[in-house]
């Protein structure tokens, strides 16, 4: 791992959003400042935050060809690299690590140093929170990662185990919340905060909601710790994100959404077959907000009342043009200005699961579940939520690829889940409903849905059709799914002893078939 400290110039900020050599985003940042004003109004520390927040998310390689594919939101019509690539479980691109360390962790440490030297405690706490926001995503890709020892000048940099990492996160969230609680009316962040306009009380809700997210994530691996931390999040007087007006969003700062570029400018991504199966089968009113109809009516002849068509992930593809008539994302994504990091719908679904697990204060599972669906429909401006929640018969549909020969790329739906809540159902079926709806609500924010799928097995997604996994990166048995991304090559060659230590902490080979600690192979209840 490169140990050099980034020297960032606050007068000229670039959000490093390039994901391939061809992907460039022009970001016009309204929060940039000039040299003359750097020492005024906190500019010398605050000017970094737009870049920090902007680099929490990945783009084409980090999301579209990893989490977005593995969570089965989007699929490619393009047979990249001869059709043998990430989407078929042969890993060719693995770059989220670099984004988090080069573009988030390094500058965040610089900001914390400046803030601590100037006794700007709120700015320091803010940067520490952003580090957790980013690294808590990265760990779901790889497992053990470098956190406590980041910035070390030792020849070997050791990784944090997942268990240690979550304990550190929770301790630091305590410290961050204490700073925020002591400074609720602080206004210094306002001009640099495109998420909450400097409202510290809303950042406090995010701290609690993030704590709840992490507690739910480790609820199978460390149930006692998860319960303690989840109940702490629920009980905190600052509250949780339970209104869409409090959703934590991250501005694109004048740039284009990566998914819009890939879909509309490159023509390289489409609706997944999994999304077609669930959205069409459940008669979901959000389908027209997420996607636009296919341009060839013949491809949706099996359900003409829902004119949408997806591509199976890991599909056997011959030519790109075969599937480009399938459903693109909605045109509205061209003008989107921000994206959700953590929203009310997710919080309600987490509370629903917490209620199933008996966590104090979580409330009623049914009410939370329905509130999660309602929050998602409202956030997307979709209609028909009441009839949707009352539907006890509609189920995900089987998939047919009309552009392939015979049954190539087809699948029979593994899921028979319905939407309507039934208190008489088992906790397992209730959990399937909760996670299925959490997945549907989490569209184009794939990190947590991919984590949920590996943790719970829900929703019951189709397997990839073409599995090209091999001994190069690990073999995924037929009928199973990828478990993680391997450690990056730069670490394998530049921090070999650190990787050996990390692999021990991983508890299995450094390949895509090794389960992560937060997603053990055990019953959900």
Q: Positions of the model-derived regions?
A:
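C-terminal functional modules
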Residues: 377, 381-525
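Short, compositionally biased low-complexity segments
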Residues: 19-29, 76-84, 139-146, 395-410
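Short coil/turn segments at secondary-structure boundaries
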Residues: 64-68, 291-293, 446-455
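Structured, solvent-exposed acidic/aromatic patches
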Residues: 76-384, 423-432, 437
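Bacterial Sec-dependent N-terminal signal peptides
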Residues: 1-30
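Membrane-proximal, proline-rich intrinsically disordered regions
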Residues: 19-72, 106, 110, 459, ...
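Residue-level signal for alpha-helical context at structural boundaries
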Residues: 63, 70-71, 150, 187, ...
């Amino acid at each position: 791992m490169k140990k050099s400290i980034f020297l960032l110039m606050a007068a000229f900020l670039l959000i490093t959003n390039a994901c391939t050599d061809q992907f460039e985003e022009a970001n016009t940042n309204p929060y940039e400042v000039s040299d003359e004003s750097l020492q005024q109004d906190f500019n010398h520390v605050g000017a970094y935050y737009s870049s920090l927040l902007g680099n929490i998310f990945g783009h084409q390689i980090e999301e579209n060809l990893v989490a977005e594919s593995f969570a089965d939101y989007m699929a490619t019509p393009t047979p990249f690299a001869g059709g043998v690539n990430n989407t078929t479980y042969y890993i060719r691109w693995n770059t989220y690590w670099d984004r988090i360390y080069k573009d988030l962790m390094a500058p965040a440490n610089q900001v914390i140093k400046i803030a601590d030297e100037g006794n700007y405690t709120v700015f320091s706490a803010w940067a520490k929170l952003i580090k957790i926001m980013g690294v808590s995503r990265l760990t779901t890709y790889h497992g053990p990662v470098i956190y406590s020892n980041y910035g070390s000048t030792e020849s070997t940099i050791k990784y944090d185990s997942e268990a240690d990492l979550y304990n550190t996160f929770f301790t630091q969230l305590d410290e961050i919340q204490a700073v925020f609680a002591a400074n609720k009316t602080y206004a210094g962040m306002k001009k640099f905060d495109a998420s909450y306009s400097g409202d510290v009380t809303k950042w406090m809700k995010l701290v609690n909601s993030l704590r709840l997210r992490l507690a739910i994530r480790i609820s199978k691996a460390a149930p006692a710790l998860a319960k303690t931390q989840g109940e702490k999040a629920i009980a905190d007087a600052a509250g949780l994100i339970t209104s869409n007006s409090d959703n934590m969003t991250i501005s694109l700062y004048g740039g284009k959404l990566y998914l819009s570029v890939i879909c509309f400018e490159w023509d390289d991504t489409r609706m997944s077959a999994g999304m077609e199966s669930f959205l069409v089968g459940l008669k979901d009113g959000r389908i027209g907000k997420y996607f636009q109809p296919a341009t060839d009516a013949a491809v949706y002849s099996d359900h003409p009342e829902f004119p949408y068509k997806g591509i199976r992930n890991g599909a056997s593809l011959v030519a790109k043009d075969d599937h480009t008539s399938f459903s693109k994302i909605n045109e509205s994504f061209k003008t989107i200005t921000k994206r959700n990091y953590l929203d009310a719908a997710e919080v309600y679904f987490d509370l629903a699961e917490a209620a199933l697990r008996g966590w104090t204060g979580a409330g009623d599972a049914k009410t939370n579940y329905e509130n999660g669906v309602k929050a998602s429909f409202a956030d997307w401006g979709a209609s028909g939520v009441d009839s949707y929640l009352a539907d006890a018969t509609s189920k995900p549909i089987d998939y047919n690829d009309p552009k392939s020969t015979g049954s190539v790329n087809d699948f029979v739906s593994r899921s028979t889940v319905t939407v309507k809540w039934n208190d008489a159902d088992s906790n397992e079926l209730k959990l399937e409903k909760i996670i299925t709806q959490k997945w549907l609500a989490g569209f184009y924010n794939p990190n947590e849905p991919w984590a949920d799928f590996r943790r719970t097995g829900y929703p019951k997604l189709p397997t990839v059709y073409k599995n090209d996994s091999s001994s190069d990166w690990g073999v995924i048995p037929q009928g199973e799914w990828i478990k993680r991304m391997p450690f990056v090559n730069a670490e394998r060659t530049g921090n070999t002893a650190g990787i050996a230590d990390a692999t021990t902490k991983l508890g299995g080979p450094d390949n895509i078939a090794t389960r992560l600690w937060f997603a053990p192979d055990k019953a959900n209840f």
